[in-house]
C-alpha cells in the first residue's frame, strides 16, 4: 500500500504561510496578513522564487530587528510595552545629517530616523502625517539618540535632503519588510525616505545588510554613516 502525504504537505505550507504573514502583520501595525502575502507573491514573481521563501525572509529580517530593538531597550532601561516619544529635543545640525531615536509600536522598538533639511529643520516620515518638514526642536527623542553624518560630499548630502523635502506630503507606509522593492515616489516610511534620498542623489546604498527591507538601524549601522553626537 502506498501512502500519499502530498495533501498534508500542502496544508503544512499553507499553515506556515499564514503564520508568517500573521506574525509579520502584528509587527507592522497598519498592514494585514493578506497584504503581506500579496506583497510576497508579487516580489516572488519578480525574483522567480517561491512566495514561501520571500515570506520566510520577510519574517527572518523583521524578527531579527525586533530582537535587536528589545536588546537595546533592555540596556537603556526603556519599556518595550510601547508608546514613548522621548523627552529630549534634537539639536541643530548640518543639512543632510541624519538622526536616530528609539521608537515603539506593537511592543517593538523599531527605531525612527529622519534627516536635517536645514540647520534648524528636519524632514521625516511619520504615521498620520506622512512625509513632513518641521523645526528641529519640534521632534522629541529618547535618551541616547544619535546624530550621524553620511560619508558623501556636501553637495550630495544637500541634494539628498532637498529630494526628501520634495516628497513632503507623501503618505506614510507601514511596509518595512519590502520597502526596498517599492517605488521611490508615493507612500514611504522613515527609513525608506532616507534610503531613497541617498540612493538617488548620492548613488550609495545606506542599508547595511541589503535585505528585502531597510530598517532604521540598518541605516545607523551602515559603513556610510558615522555618529557625531549622542543626545543624553
Where are these regions (language model features)?
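Glycine-rich catalytic cores of cysteine/serine-nucleophile enzymes that process amide/ester linkages
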Residues: 91-151, 174-185
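Residue-level preference for non-acidic, small/hydrophobic
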Residues: 96-99, 114, 164, 194, ...
Amino acid at each position: 500500500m502506498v501512502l500519499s502525504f502530498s495533501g498534508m504537505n500542502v496544508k503544512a505550507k499553507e499553515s506556515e504561510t499564514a503564520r508568517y504573514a500573521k506574525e509579520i502583520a502584528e509587527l507592522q501595525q497598519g498592514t494585514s496578513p493578506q497584504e503581506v502575502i500579496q506583497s510576497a507573491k508579487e516580489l516572488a514573481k519578480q525574483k522567480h522564487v517561491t512566495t514561501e521563501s520571500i515570506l520566510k525572509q520577510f519574517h527572518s529580517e523583521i524578527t531579527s530587528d525586533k530582537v535587536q530593538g528589545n536588546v537595546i531597550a533592555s540596556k537603556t532601561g526603556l519599556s518595550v510595552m510601547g508608546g514613548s516619544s522621548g523627552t529630549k529635543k534634537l539639536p541643530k545640525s548640518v543639512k543632510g545629517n541624519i538622526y536616530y531615536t528609539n521608537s515603539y509600536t506593537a511592543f517593538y522598538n523599531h527605531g525612527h530616523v529622519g534627516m536635517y533639511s536645514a540647520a534648524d529643520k528636519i524632514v521625516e516620515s511619520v504615521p498620520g502625517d506622512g512625509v513632513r518638514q518641521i523645526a528641529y526642536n519640534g521632534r522629541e527623542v529618547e535618551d541616547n539618540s544619535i546624530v550621524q553624518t553620511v560619508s558623501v560630499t556636501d553637495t550630495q548630502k544637500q541634494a539628498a535632503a532637498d529630494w526628501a523635502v520634495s516628497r513632503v506630503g507623501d503618505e506614510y507606509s507601514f511596509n518595512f519588510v519590502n520597502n526596498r522593492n517599492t517605488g521611490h515616489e508615493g507612500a514611504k516610511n522613515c527609513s525608506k525616505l532616507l534610503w531613497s534620498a541617498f540612493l538617488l542623489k548620492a548613488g550609495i546604498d545606506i542599508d547595511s545588510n541589503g535585505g528585502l527591507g531597510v530598517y532604521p538601524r540598518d541605516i545607523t549601522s551602515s559603513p556610510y554613516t558615522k555618529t557625531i553626537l549622542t543626545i543624553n
